[in-house]
């Protein structure tokens, strides 16, 4: 029986494909390219799970665009960035997690500029760090926190480099459009203040704004002891 499930070649019993099936020989390890399925480089249609639809749902595996069962992509056990193709995992810095998070479709890692070394160089631009995830080797330059800078914030000086800079502030200072939560960094801006969108509501006395942070309690964001008690205010993550 051939890999199209046809006995004696590809007749009308081959899902209606007829002779255009290209013979569907078992030597291709799956469906022959003439079947409209996997080519011989794919390693067989058995590698094309329905969970791979859209080339971005492979879980711990990696979607490789060059070996697809149309309209789905094949998942491979580990992320081999060299096989992910231009604009895909290859521009994520080469880590397994980086590739998995970015997927292989245009607009993922490509939106970071596709520069070597990961998405950290995107500087927090739209569709940047948040899209790539945030583990060492992928978006590690974004701080390495789970979810990436875009999702979990950049309140530490090591979190977002390069980062947006507001006028009069040091190069490592995050601007509101750069990182979330919108926090100034202790190395470049004073006071150590978080904007209202940085902290969750606190149990503060009336008259204290949520943008008020205490320098000694910068991580997580806290209300200043001079205006509120209790002092704690968790950062939004």
UniProtKB/Swiss-Prot annotation:
Q: What is this protein called?
A: Keratin-associated protein 5-5
Tissue-specificity statement: Restricted to hair root, not detected in any other tissues.
Q: Does the keyword Ion transport apply?
A: no
Role played: In the hair cortex, hair keratin intermediate filaments are embedded in an interfilamentous matrix, consisting of hair keratin-associated protein (KRTAP), which are essential for the formation of a rigid and resistant hair shaft through their extensive disulfide bond cross-linking with abundant cysteine residues of hair keratins. The matrix proteins include the high-sulfur and high-glycine-tyrosine keratins.
Q: Which family does it belong to?
A: Belongs to the KRTAP type 5 family.
8 X 4 AA repeats of C-C-X-P: annotated segments: 62-230
Keywords of the record: Keratin, Repeat
Swiss-Prot/TrEMBL sequence repeat ranges: 62-65, 68-71, 74-77, 159-162, 178-181, 188-191, 198-201, 227-230
- Kindly list the GO CC terms recorded for this protein: cytosol; intermediate filament
């Amino acid at each position: 029986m051939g890999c199209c499930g046809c006995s004696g070649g590809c007749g009308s019993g081959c899902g209606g494909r007829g002779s255009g099936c290209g013979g569907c020989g078992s030597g291709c390890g799956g469906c022959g390219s003439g079947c409209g399925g996997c080519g011989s480089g794919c390693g067989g249609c058995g590698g094309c799970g329905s969970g791979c639809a859209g080339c971005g749902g492979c879980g711990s595996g990696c979607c490789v665009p060059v070996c697809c069962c149309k309209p789905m992509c094949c998942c491979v056990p580990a992320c081999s960035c060299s096989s992910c193709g231009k604009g895909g995992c290859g521009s994520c810095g080469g880590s397994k997690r980086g590739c998995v998070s970015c997927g292989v479709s245009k607009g993922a890692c490509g939106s970071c500029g596709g520069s070597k070394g990961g998405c950290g160089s995107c500087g927090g631009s739209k569709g940047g760090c948040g899209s790539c995830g945030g583990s060492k080797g992928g978006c590690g330059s974004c701080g390495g926190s789970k979810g990436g800078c875009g999702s979990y914030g950049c309140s530490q000086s090591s979190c977002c480099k390069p980062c947006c800079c507001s006028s009069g502030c040091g190069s490592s200072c995050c601007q509101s459009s750069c990182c979330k939560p919108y926090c100034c960094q202790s190395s470049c801006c004073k006071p150590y203040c978080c904007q209202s969108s940085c902290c969750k509501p606190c149990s503060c006395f009336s008259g204290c704004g949520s943008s008020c942070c205490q320098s000694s309690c910068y991580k997580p964001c806290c209300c200043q002891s001079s205006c509120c008690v209790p002092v704690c205010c968790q950062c939004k993550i």
